UniProtKB/Swiss-Prot annotation:
Lineage summary: Bacteria, Pseudomonadati, Pseudomonadota, Gammaproteobacteria, Enterobacterales
Annotated gene: glpG
Its EC number(s): 3.4.21.105
Any one Gene Ontology molecular-function term assigned to this protein's record: serine-type endopeptidase activity
One biological process term in Gene Ontology: proteolysis
Catalytic reaction(s) noted: Cleaves type-1 transmembrane domains using a catalytic dyad composed of serine and histidine that are contributed by different transmembrane domains
InterPro entries: GlpG_N_sf, Peptidase_S54_GlpG_N, Peptidase_S54_rhomboid_dom, Rhomboid-like_sf, Rhomboid_protease_GlpG
Name of the top EC class for this enzyme: hydrolase
Active site: S201, H254
Taxonomic superkingdom: Bacteria
Entry protein name: Rhomboid protease GlpG
Family, as annotated: Belongs to the peptidase S54 family.
Amino acid sequence: MLMITSFANPRVAQAFVDYMATQGVILTIQQHNQSDVWLADESQAERVRAELARFLGNPADPRYLAASWQSGHTDSGLHYRRYPFFAALRERAGPVTWVMMIACVVVFIAMQILGDQEVMLWLAWPFDPTLKFEFWRYFTHALMHFSLMHILFNLLWWWYLGGAVEKRLGSGKLIVITLISALLSGYVQQKFSGPWFGGLSGVVYALMGYVWLRGERDPQSGIYLQRGLIIFALIWIVAGWFDLFGMSMANGAHIAGLAVGLAMAFVDSLNARKRK
């Protein structure tokens, strides 16, 4: 037997299995930490992977629900645990995801108590040649947020995307994406606006680009982002570039972060294909 993929949500796994059954392909689900989908007839692997890519691109397509109705599995018979809010947060987020979220919250509280300027003197991108060897500054600008909406928006996306990467690909992969995107998006942004900027959005855009393209090119990675969300990200970049909402946005960081994420996903998916 060959394991095709794993789903965090058992209902999503059942929908894919039901659809493949209507196509004459029998898959089975084994429940461990996630719902693992297995194929008995390995000669059909390429066909199943191609269908999986289409499924991940639009899992809400009516044909998948229709397949579940046809197979009589709209109620999969699985019993789901009910999680309180914080338990649900823990379920998706790994240690690196949590450490970053806590660090951002601590820095945000410090900025409210001490003032933005005081904290930026310690964490901002090097604003003087004498500070260029304070290497933490090339990364800690990502920890600073200047409003409640700013930090909530970024941490929500960080938890959603970063948590998925960490759970599926490991803490090391999330750390690498975070460090590279923080460094390069910060470098580009300081060329646009100088050193006085902050926020996790460059890293968030890198994760958006990475999760979307890695899911498109390597469905077996187990991560994906709906195309509508990546389109939203592009619209947001355009809106920020033309100042359509009258908001101060780190446009350089957004563009650089997205480019970094796409580039890393392309390389990783290429390497994954070579290993097959």
